[in-house]
UniProtKB/Swiss-Prot annotation:
EC number in record: 7.1.2.2
Catalytic activity: ATP + H2O + 4 H(+)(in) = ADP + phosphate + 5 H(+)(out)
Gene Ontology terms: biological process: proton motive force-driven plasma membrane ATP synthesis
InterPro entries, per database record: ATP-synt_VA_C, ATP-synth_a_Xtn, ATP_synth_asu-like_sf, ATP_synth_asu_arc, ATPase_a/bsu_AS, ATPase_F1/V1/A1_a/bsu_N, ATPase_F1/V1/A1_a/bsu_N_sf, ATPase_F1/V1/A1_a/bsu_nucl-bd
Binding site for ATP: G238, P239, F240, G241, S242, G243, K244, T245
Gene Ontology MF term list: ATP binding; proton-transporting ATP synthase activity, rotational mechanism; proton-transporting ATPase activity, rotational mechanism
Main location: membrane
Alphabetical UniProt keywords: ATP synthesis, ATP-binding, Cell membrane, Hydrogen ion transport, Ion transport, Membrane, Nucleotide-binding, Translocase, Transport
Protein name (record): A-type ATP synthase subunit A
Lineage: Archaea, Methanobacteriati, Methanobacteriota, Stenosarchaea group, Halobacteria
Membrane-topology descriptor: Peripheral membrane protein
Length: 586
């Protein structure tokens, strides 16, 4: 977040009352959503309500010690972010202040109030390579040059979306900082490498298109059963300790997006520390470079001011849209949207608004929709295509999925990954309940899997779903009468389903090989279980007792496929052994 520019001189106001993060001021000449600086320390805040000459402000910093009578300075500008080279590999707070720069300024890891810094380094020079020539006509959004921001990502310098465009009269390659002019147009407009954009305003596009390509996560249960599309939306609700954050970390590490924006919204500080420590050491499987080269982190932990939780999700989605405009596929992880909703509830109650269900404000659904609807696969105004995929964790108290945040989120998103405390207690991770989860993208993504993985992907997956569904029904009977009371074919189905659960749905996030599973391997593990199923039922039909079928030496080797680096050879040998050992029984 940059210091707001004084483009519109405004009169200062006087603080009238202070209630936590909510401050009221009188005689302040301001507009809705303007940034203001509150008190003698200049704490950043945002106008959220105006009634007569009384202005209500939510303050993005701790307000202890602020008293009535202190001044409030208006800026005339809405809450905006700096967009330009230098955002990748950066760690921001909820209003885009770079934490490493603030630490240098303060000389301490503990930040004083009222300290500000530009969102991107204004002094650092970048190597600019033109993409257009003098005499070319450019319009709003057009790419005029590139900057090698990291080894993985070329930053594309664009004409601002609100520009009138024109003919290029001056452009040259060289090293420039972000405030220097790199392109001059015939109408006198000068284009720099950075631009500002209000966080609450969606960046313009030509058209929102139907997504047809999956966002490959490397997690078998997600890619195999509940895929999300590039440009899709997903929710991960679950009780405490069920694995929401580790699942989000896995997605941030291995999703095949070009850019990842990770927003830690009101979660534990040590979880953000884990991201900051792990990501620089991890290798991006697509490029071979460090994962941080494609990652932007926004850390707004639980001990930071409540009001900034709202700004951090908008800051994250605006940065994601900026990279989308370059033609990149962006994945945004928000962990957790429940903390943002709780911040809305606190501020709403301080404003004495009429509460809705469980005390949340009546506009909870509208705010969530506003956020998730900025996701999508778009044709950009410069002719490129890009996507923003949004994956939001939800933390319902006690794992109650009927609470308002979960229910309102489910009305908006198209993929639902339900985390289950019972699975987590049984050490089944990722603890995504395959009976409760769903993906509405499954059918529209099937053609991609048929073309790029295997033609029989949908049929094999449907067999796995049917087997797991049948197991869920049989388990209710087993709990009443025991497994031995079932017919032999149903006992065999339970055994096959167990291998599906243990070999295919379970995955070790901390194993070097098993942490990431490509779609081909996901298919082969599923198909190996189906091979065992088909051969086992043939043996059963030939009169072989179920105990002998399940007792073959080859079957337990299914559970070790996930950790095999050279899995194709391993599975080929395993399938041959399964079929030959079962044939020997009859």
């Amino acid at each position: 977040m940059s210091q707001a520019t004084d483009t519109d001189v405004r009169e200062d106001g006087i603080i009238e009352s202070v209630s936590g993060p909510v401050v009221t001021a009188r005689d302040l000449d301001a507009r809705m959503n303007d940034v203001v600086y509150v008190g003698s320390e200049g704490l950043m805040g945002e106008v959220i309500e105006i009634e007569g000459n009384i202005t209500t402000i939510q303050v993005y910093e701790e307000t202890s010690g602020v008293s009535p009578g202190e001044p409030v300075e208006g800026t005339g500008s809405p809450l905006s972010v700096d967009l330009g080279p230098g955002m990748l590999d950066a760690i921001y707070d909820g209003v885009q202040r770079p934490l490493d720069v603030l630490e240098e300024k303060m000389g301490s890891a503990f930040l004083d109030r009222g300290v500000d810094a530009p969102g991107i380094d204004l002094e650092k020079t970048w190597e600019f390579t033109p993409e257009v020539e003098e005499g070319d006509e450019v319009e709003a959004g057009d790419i005029v040059g590139t900057v090698p921001e990291t080894p993985s990502i070329d930053h594309k310098v664009m004409v601002p979306p609100d520009s009138e465009g024109g003919e290029v009269v001056a452009i040259e390659s060289g090293n420039f900082n972000v405030e220097e002019t790199v392109v001059e147009l015939d109408n006198g407009e000068e284009i720099q490498m950075h631009q500002e954009w209000p966080v609450r305003q969606q960046r313009p596009t030509v058209e929102k298109e139907t997504p047809t390509e999956p966002l490959i996560s490397g997690q078998r249960v997600l890619d195999g059963l509940f895929p999300i599309a590039k440009g899709g939306t997903a929710a991960i609700p679950g009780p405490f300790g069920s694995g929401k954050t580790v699942t989000q970390h896995q997605l941030a590490k291995w999703a095949d997006a070009d850019i990842v924006v990770y927003v830690g919204c009101g979660e534990r500080g040590n979880e953000m520390t884990e991201v900051i420590e792990d990501f620089p050491e991890l290798e991006d499987p697509t490029t071979g470079n460090a994962l941080m080269d494609r990652t932007c982190l926004i850390a707004n932990t639980s001990n930071m001011p409540v009001a900034a939780r709202e700004s951090c999700v908008y800051t994250g989605i605006t940065i994601a849209e900026y990279f989308r405009d370059m033609g990149y596929d962006v994945a945004l992880m928000a962990d957790s949207t429940s903390r943002w909703a709780e911040a809305m509830r606190e501020i709403s109650s301080r404003l004495e608004e009429m509460p809705g269900e469980e005390g949340y404000p009546a506009y909870l659904s509208a705010r969530l929709s506003e956020f998730y609807e900025r996701a999508g696969y778009f044709e950009n105004i410069n002719g490129t295509e890009g996507s923003v995929s949004v994956i939001g964790a939800v933390s319902p108290p006690g794992g109650d999925f009927s609470e308002p945040v979960t229910q309102n989120t489910l009305r908006i998103v198209k993929t639902f990954w339900a985390l289950d405390a019972d699975l987590a207690e049984r050490r089944h991770f990722p603890s995504i309940n395959w009976n409760e989860s769903y993906s509405l993208y499954r059918d529209q993504l099937d053609p991609w899997f048929e073309d790029n993985v295997r033609a029989d992907w949908p049929e094999t997956r449907q067999w796995a779903i049917d087997t797991l569904d049948e197991e869920a029904e049989l388990q209710e009977i087993v709990q009443l009468v025991g497994k031995d009371a079932l017919p032999e074919d149903q006992q065999l189905t339970l055994e096959i389903a167990r291998y599906l659960r243990e070999a295919w749905l379970q995955q070790n996030a901390f194993h070097d090989v098993d942490t990431f599973c490509e779609p081909e391997k996901t298919y082969r593990i599923m198909d190996a279980a189906k091979t065992y199923n088909d051969a086992a039922f043939e043996a059963l039909d030939a009169g072989v007792p179920v105990e002998e079928i399940t007792d073959i030496d080859a079957a337990p080797r299914l559970n070790r496929i996930g950790v095999q680096e050279d899995y194709n050879e391993y599975i080929d040998d395993l399938e041959d052994d399964i079929e030959s050992q079962l044939r020997e029984l009859y």
